[in-house]
Amino acid sequence: ATYYKVKLLTPEGEKEFECPDDVYILDNAEEIGIDLPYSCRAGSCSSCAGKVVSGKVDNSDNSFLNDDNMDAGYVLTCHAYANSDVVIETHKEEEV
């Protein structure tokens, strides 16, 4: 796997870690002890929503976000793979 730097901008401050391109960002964050919101873990709700500030993610597995949300940079971290070094604002459920 290729590893990318993921920086999460959370209400508790910045969290940065290396994430392989074949592990969902939410799963990887949890493994290293970063507590992020989630509910279904299936890409079909908005509990884990975040917004990409820079970089690229593959969020094509999600079934909740519409094209407008995705065009605006919103992702579901439970079903998002890093495709580059990426910065994501977390806790965006209210916005989607």
UniProtKB/Swiss-Prot annotation:
Kindly state which keywords UniProt assigns to this record, in alphabetical order: 2Fe-2S, Chloroplast, Electron transport, Iron, Iron-sulfur, Metal-binding, Plastid, Transport
Family matches, as InterPro entries: 2Fe-2S_ferredoxin-like_sf, 2Fe-2S_ferredoxin-type, 2Fe2S_fd_BS, Beta-grasp_dom_sf, Fd_pln
Protein name in the entry: Ferredoxin
Record's family?
Belongs to the 2Fe2S plant-type ferredoxin family.
NCBIfam families xref list: fdx_plant
| GO terms, biological process | electron transport chain; ferredoxin metabolic process
Binding residues for [2Fe-2S] cluster: 40, 45, 48, 78
Its organism's taxonomic lineage begins at: Eukaryota, Viridiplantae, Streptophyta, Embryophyta, Tracheophyta
Please name the Pfam families in this protein's record. Answer: Fer2
